[in-house]
């Protein structure tokens, strides 16, 4: 009877009923704990609930695995695509770096042309200054100088037809306080003053200004504010005072043509050009050592009794406290 009930019922009700029957002694304990070897036919009663549970668990696990497999497949495919895209990107970056290196190498000659272009720019500026003055002071003169002067004074500008002036006459008008010369003409004349007319003496040796010579030498020197930059200023100043800028420029270019470094070329100028031999360096008055360019600090030395430029002494810095330091190369 109770076997039939066990087969029909299952779940908590069956468990409670079995417990009650065991407590009251209506069901023998041996009938519940079946000996598998002796009573294989009763395995169905005891294992029936567990077999259902086991089936449900297995089915749930199988469903979970079935659900995860496509997701894992998608993740794997996505990672594969990401790795492939990253590899292509790395290859593209490497190719771009190679192209940039090639482009940089190709542009290096153009960078070296910068110095030549700078020199041409200065030459063109002088040519423009000459042209400005030429237009203002020469041409088909149809009026006298007096008429031109009257027109300038009245209209504050040159007449439409340019008047022909000699350079010396124009210089005399500019120097004469009673004569009126337009500002534009004066400016053009000052710009032209940086050049000189070709003669038998300076033919093939075009005049160069101290500013242009300084810029040319600066273009060859590395860094900024070094002792050699200071030496360039001293050389240009002394060369301008002695009207030997052309000689200094020629000496500098000759040293470079011989393969000397720019620094060596500057030193050769101080030893070969007579105006620098046995000449004391200039004295520069400063407030403190901090006013000296940082690049020159390591080249400062206590000033000797009689320093000379051709012995490597560029200049002397005299501070307010009376201390004097020499710039030595």
UniProtKB/Swiss-Prot annotation:
Gene3D superfamilies the record matches? Filoviridae VP35, C-terminal inhibitory domain, beta-sheet subdomain, Filoviridae VP35, C-terminal inhibitory domain, helical subdomain
Similarity section: Belongs to the filoviridae polymerase cofactor VP35 family.
Give the organism the record lists.
Answer: Reston ebolavirus (strain Philippines-96) (REBOV)
Q: Which gene encodes it?
A: VP35
Which residues are annotated with the PTM Phosphoserine? 194, 306
Residues with the modification Phosphothreonine, per the entry, are: 195, 199
Q: What is its main location?
A: virion
Q: Which domain of life is it from?
A: Viruses
Question: Subunit structure, per the record?
Answer: Homodimer. Homooligomer; via the coiled coil domain. Interacts with nucleoprotein NP and polymerase L; VP35 bridges L and NP and allows the formation of the polymerase complex. Also interacts with VP30; this interaction is regulated by VP30 phosphorylation. Interacts with host IKBKE and TBK1; the interactions lead to inhibition of cellular antiviral response by blocking necessary interactions of IKBKE and TBK1 with their substrate IRF3.
Keywords of the record: Coiled coil, Host cytoplasm, Host-virus interaction, Inhibition of host IKBKE by virus, Inhibition of host innate immune response by virus, Inhibition of host IRF7 by virus, Inhibition of host RLR pathway by virus, Inhibition of host TBK1 by virus, Inhibition of host TLR pathway by virus, Interferon antiviral system evasion, Isopeptide bond, Phosphoprotein, RNA-binding, Suppressor of RNA silencing, Transcription, Ubl conjugation, Viral immunoevasion, Viral RNA replication, Virion
> Tell me, what does this protein do in biology?
Plays an essential role in viral RNA synthesis and also a role in suppressing innate immune signaling. Acts as a polymerase cofactor in the RNA polymerase transcription and replication complexes. Serves as nucleoprotein/NP monomer chaperone prior to the formation of the large oligomeric RNA-bound complexes. Regulates RNA synthesis by modulating NP-RNA interactions and interacting with DYNLL1. VP35-NP interaction controls the switch between RNA-bound NP and free NP and thus the switch between genome replication and genome packaging into the nucleocapsid.
Q: Where in the cell is it found?
A: Virion; Host cytoplasm
UniProt-recorded name of the protein: Polymerase cofactor VP35
């Amino acid at each position: 009877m109770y076997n039939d009930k066990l087969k029909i019922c299952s779940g908590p009700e069956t468990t409670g009923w079995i417990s009650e029957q065991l407590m009251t002694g209506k069901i023998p304990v041996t009938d519940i704990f079946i000996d598998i070897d002796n009573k294989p036919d009763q395995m169905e009663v005891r294992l029936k609930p567990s077999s259902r549970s086991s089936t449900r668990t297995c089915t749930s696990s199988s469903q979970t695995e079935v659900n995860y497999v496509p997701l894992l497949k998608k993740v794997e495919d996505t990672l594969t695509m990401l790795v492939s895209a990253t590899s292509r990107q790395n290859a593209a970056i490497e190719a771009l770096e190679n192209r940039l290196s090639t482009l940089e190498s190709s542009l290096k000659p153009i960078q070296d042309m910068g110095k030549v272009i700078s020199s041409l720019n200065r030459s063109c500026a002088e040519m423009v200054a000459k042209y400005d003055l030429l237009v203002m002071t020469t041409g088909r003169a149809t009026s006298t100088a007096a008429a031109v002067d009257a027109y300038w004074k009245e209209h504050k500008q040159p007449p439409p037809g340019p008047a022909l002036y000699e350079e010396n006459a124009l210089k005399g008008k500019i120097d004469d306080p009673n004569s009126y010369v337009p500002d534009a003409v004066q400016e053009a004349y000052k710009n032209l003053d940086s050049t000189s007319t070709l003669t038998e003496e300076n033919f093939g040796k075009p005049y160069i200004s101290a500013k242009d010579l300084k810029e040319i030498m600066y273009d060859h020197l590395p860094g900024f504010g070094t002792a050699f930059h200071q030496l360039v200023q001293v050389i240009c100043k002394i060369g301008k005072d002695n009207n030997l800028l052309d000689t200094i420029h020629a000496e500098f270019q000759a040293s470079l043509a011989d393969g000397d470094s720019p620094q060596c070329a500057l030193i050769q100028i101080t030893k070969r050009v007579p105006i620098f031999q046995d000449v004391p360096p200039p004295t520069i008055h400063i407030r403190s050592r901090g006013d000296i360019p940082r690049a020159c600090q390591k080249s400062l030395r206590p000033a000797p009794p009689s320093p000379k430029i051709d012995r490597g002494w560029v200049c002397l810095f005299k501070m307010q406290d009376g201390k004097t330091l020499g710039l030595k190369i």
